[in-house]
Curated annotation (Swiss-Prot):
Family according to the record: Belongs to the acyltransferase 3 family.
Localisation per UniProt entry: Cell membrane
Function: Seems to regulate the surface properties of the bacterium in the presence of plant cells or plant cell extracts.
Subcellular location, principal: membrane
InterPro entries linked to this entry: Acyl_transf_3_dom, Acyltransferase_3
Stored PANTHER family: ACETYLTRANSFERASE (PTHR23028), PUTATIVE (AFU_ORTHOLOGUE AFUA_4G08520)-RELATED (PTHR23028:SF134)
Name this protein carries in UniProt: Protein 2 in picA locus
Classification via Pfam families: Acyl_transf_3
Protein induction: By certain acidic polysaccharides found in carrot root extract. This induction may be regulated by the polygalacturonase.
C-alpha cells in the first residue's frame, strides 16, 4: 500500500512567497528603494501561514507521539540552518573586508570601524544561533545577519509548540491567543 503524498496548500504557498518577497525588499531597501508602507506586516503574515502549515504537517504526529519534539526541532533546524550559515559567512566576509580596508560599517547607525573582537564574538554567537549582547548591524538586531532575529524567534516558538502547543487544550489555546492579542495591542500602541 503506497502512502499518499502530503497535502500541499498551493494558494498559501503563493501568499507566503509574496510575503517573503516583501520581507526581502524590506531588508534590502538599499538595493530596491524604500520599502512599501507596512511591509513589516509581511513577517507576521509569513509566520502565521508557516505556523498553519507546520501545525498541519506535524501537529497530529506530535500529539500522537509518532515523532518527538526533539525530532521536530532537528527537522526545523536542518531546514533553516544551512542557508543561515551561508548568509552568516557572507556577512562575516563583508565585515572582514571592511576591517582590512579600514572602512566603517555603512549599515550601523554609528558608522564605526569594525572591532575584530566584537566580530569574532558575534560570529560565534551567530553560529550558535544566539543573539550577541551588542550589534554590528543596523537597528540593534543583535545578530551578524540582522534578519536572523526572526529565525531565532521562530525556533523558540517551534520549541514551545513542539513541547506544549501540539497537545494544548482548547481552553489553553484560547488563553494563549487572548494574552497574545493583548500584548500585540499594547505593542501596536507603543510602536
Amino acid at each position: 500500500m503506497s502512502q499518499s503524498p502530503p497535502e500541499r496548500f498551493i494558494l498559501l504557498d503563493g501568499i507566503r512567497g509574496v510575503a517573503a518577497l516583501f520581507i526581502v525588499h524590506r531588508h534590502a531597501e538599499q538595493f530596491f528603494g524604500r520599502d512599501p508602507a507596512s511591509s513589516y506586516l509581511a513577517v507576521d503574515l509569513f509566520f502565521a501561514l508557516s505556523g498553519f502549515v507546520l501545525a498541519h504537517a506535524y501537529g497530529k504526529k506530535l500529539y500522537e507521539g509518532t515523532i518527538t519534539p526533539g525530532f521536530f526541532l532537528k527537522a526545523r533546524f536542518a531546514r533553516l540552518y544551512p542557508l543561515y550559515v551561508l548568509a552568516l559567512a557572507l556577512m562575516a566576509a563583508y565585515f572582514i573586508c571592511l576591517y582590512v580596508l579600514g572602512l566603517p560599517t555603512p549599515i550601523d547607525d554609528l558608522h564605526r570601524l569594525i572591532d575584530p573582537g566584537e566580530l569574532a564574538f558575534a560570529l560565534v554567537t551567530g553560529l550558535l544561533f544566539l543573539p550577541a549582547p551588542f550589534t554590528l548591524t543596523l537597528n540593534g538586531a543583535l545578530f551578524l545577519v540582522s534578519p536572523a532575529w526572526s529565525l531565532f524567534n521562530e525556533l523558540v516558538v517551534n520549541a514551545v509548540y513542539a513541547r506544549w502547543g501540539a497537545r494544548a487544550t482548547m481552553k489553553q489555546t484560547v488563553l494563549v491567543l487572548a494574552v497574545s492579542a493583548v500584548v500585540l495591542m499594547v505593542a501596536a500602541a507603543e510602536f
